[in-house]
A protein has these predicted regions:
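A conserved regulatory-domain signal marking ACT and ACT-like small-molecule sensing domains
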Residues: 41-128
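Rossmann-like dinucleotide-binding domain for NAD(H)/NADP(H)
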Residues: 1-54, 65, 98, 128
Length: 128
């Protein structure tokens, strides 16, 4: 480019067969982690949440708007069912948030439906 004090280098990305294979492995591992535990890594539109193993009871993941009183309304619905929240993570990225709760027991389908119907909640998932 001929610009003083600038050294241009190419962005290689996944431009070699080896790097393409490595990127595919990494993407597959990240998808597996999300499906098995709820871990979110390297997302451009979700906060990073790293979870390990399986909880003793049940793990529930909620994707929702990053708005006031959301976590309170979620935990109120869960407590009305007599379910204890053993552990909780809530992280946000701009206007989106993710809440992961480890519950003392598996939620009923009615509770999942109630949570899914709350304004601002985009997705509800749980693992046993």
């Amino acid at each position: 480019l001929g610009v003083k004090n600038i050294v241009c280098i190419p962005h290689l990305g996944a431009s070699t067969p080896e790097s393409e294979e490595n990127c595919a492995r990494m993407a597959a591992a990240q998808l597996r982690d999300y499906l098995e535990t709820g871990t979110i890594r390297n997302s451009v539109n979700m906060p990073e949440i790293v979870l390990s193993g399986q909880p003793e009871g049940c793990r529930i993941l909620l994707i929702h708007g990053n708005v006031p009183n959301m976590v309170s309304s979620i935990s109120a619905a869960i407590s009305r069912e007599g379910i204890n929240i053993n552990n909780m993570i809530n992280k946000s990225l701009k206007e989106m948030a993710v809440t992961v709760m480890e519950l003392s027991q598996v939620p009923t389908e009615e509770l999942i439906a109630e949570l899914s119907a709350q304004p601002g909640i985009i997705k509800v998932r749980y693992w046993r």
